[in-house]
Design a protein with these regions (language model features):
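Serine-esterase "nucleophile elbow" of acetyl-processing enzymes
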Residues: 1-41, 51-60
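Alpha-helical cap/lid subdomain in secreted, periplasmic
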Residues: 31, 49-184
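Acidic/histidine-rich helix-loop elements
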Residues: 11, 36-45, 73-77, 160
């Protein structure tokens, strides 16, 4: 698991984030999978790319989940750079023999409609080019909760960026169907 604060339990008690919940689900399903959470709060695709080779050598994973890119966008980094880094990470993981699940994100509307649409689309493009599995939006049903503005912020910490503990089961529910397909 290569991700940022959304996967590194930022602001949560240890063992309550969606990756820890995934590990418990895998155990309950009696799937012989070991989860290595190499997520770092604040990480970008460049940071993930620079760490990936060492992680692949050290752990020799059969599956790699990549949840990166949100911090690139929040920092206003060029979308082509983000896409290139995601492509390189996906290809490196696949070259090592791992199946890849790419987890997409979306940007708030204040980044502009065009930027947001292009950012969202780059995940689908990377997944398609590399024939990788894709979860289009990790925060589906959380950041885009139905109803009024209060509904869409109630599942977030005070910073309105990081989900509260009660949102993490929903995040796992967004990931599990696609992950289960590639675990077979």
């Amino acid at each position: 698991m290569l991700g940022d604060s959304l996967s590194a339990e930022y602001g949560l008690k240890r063992g309550s984030g969606w990756v820890a919940l995934l590990e418990k689900k895998l155990q309950a399903e009696k799937l012989p999978v070991t989860v290595v959470n190499a997520s770092i709060s604040g990480d970008t695709t460049a940071g993930g790319r620079s760490r990936l080779a060492g992680l692949l050598t050290q752990h020799r994973p059969t599956h790699v989940i990549i949840e990166l890119g949100a911090n690139d966008a929040l920092r206003g980094l060029p979308l082509q750079l983000t896409e290139d880094n995601l492509n390189q990470m996906t290809q490196a993981a696949q070259k090592s023999g791992a199946k890849v699940l790419l987890i997409g994100m979306q940007m708030p509307p204040n980044y502009g409609k065009d930027y947001g649409a292009r950012f969202t689309a780059l995940y689908a493009a990377v997944a398609k080019i590399n024939k990788a599995a894709l979860v289009p939006f990790l925060l589906k049903g959380i950041a885009d909760a139905p109803g009024n503005a209060a509904d869409s912020t109630r599942l977030f910490q005070a910073d309105r960026i990081h989900p509260k503990e009660e949102a993490h089961p929903l995040m796992l529910a967004n990931v599990w169907p696609e992950l289960k397909k590639i675990l077979k």
